[in-house]
Amino acid sequence: MEHKYQIFKIKEKKFIVKMDLNPLTNEFEYHMYLRHLITPQQAIAAYFSKTYETFNPERNRYELYSKSLNITVYYTYLKEKDILLITAFYQGGQYE
């Protein structure tokens, strides 16, 4: 499967989002939207409004939950400050 990435710069942070080729439309769309109907803007908002965050050493990623948005986000750091948003999805009550 062919991939591209899109960059969002917000509050001095660079968020990198994977895009996948949609086989039905033959156009690139956000991976997290194709899989979970979450936009990068929603995932970034969840990053800034996180209620809970932990590091998962088995997966080498951070996992956060935003109670106000009811969204879980998986991400990792690239080049110290750049953030690769791996995926995001709705998941209520996980850390309550």
Feature map (PLM): residue ranges:
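Ribonuclease/tRNase effector modules and their secretory precursors
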Residues: M1-E96
